[in-house]
Amino acid sequence: MSNINLATLDISEHPNLPSSSAVLFEAKARKKLSFEAIASAIGRNEVATAAIFYGQAKASAEDIVKLSEVLGIDHLYLESLLSGFPDRGKSMTFPPKDPLIYRLFEIVQNYGYAYKAVMNEKFGDGIMSAISFSTKVEKETDLDGNNWAVVTWRGKWLPYSRF
């Protein structure tokens, strides 16, 4: 377990995160659990699970029970922290300063119009939902031993209404 890479949180660098973030990350570090392990234990996707930790996704009542068990956090306390609705989007500065998050922003900045054009040609005039949405991250290793990040976005297509 000591060689596992674990995402941690320095709350002083993220002052806009909800108080639940510090509690969740402290328990995650104490238990030495990856998001993959936590997600498996609660029956959620690992990105969705991480989004709960960052206050960007709503935890269901079932999620709260399972997180409480997996992380060893008092259920009523965790419920008091996670029962509200997320205040999405205010947790970071814009443009992002973290290099990896900035690269994701840069991908959309550089390829956004290309994505839009191709999607419009395939689906018509509309948008890809970020609400009826799922995502996943996979690791791929090529024949030369190079690691590649494979990020999949899957959003429902929403055509614009004519009125």
UniProtKB/Swiss-Prot annotation:
Which residue positions are annotated as catalytic? R103, E106, S129
Coiled-coil residues: none
Reaction catalysed by this chain? cyanate + hydrogencarbonate + 3 H(+) = NH4(+) + 2 CO2
Which Enzyme Commission number(s) are on file for it?
4.2.1.104
Gene Ontology terms for molecular function: cyanate hydratase activity; DNA binding
Q: Which UniProt keywords apply?
A: Lyase
Matching InterPro entries:
Cyanase, Cyanate_lyase_C, Cyanate_lyase_C_sf, Lambda_DNA-bd_dom_sf
Q: Name one GO biological process term.
A: cyanate metabolic process
**Protein family (similarity comment):** Belongs to the cyanase family.
- Spell out the HAMAP family in the cross-references: Cyanate_hydrat
**What biological function has been recorded for the protein in this entry?**
Catalyzes the reaction of cyanate with bicarbonate to produce ammonia and carbon dioxide.
Q: What is this protein called?
A: Cyanate hydratase
Gene source species? Paracoccidioides brasiliensis (strain Pb03)
User: Which gene name belongs to this protein?
Assistant: CYN1
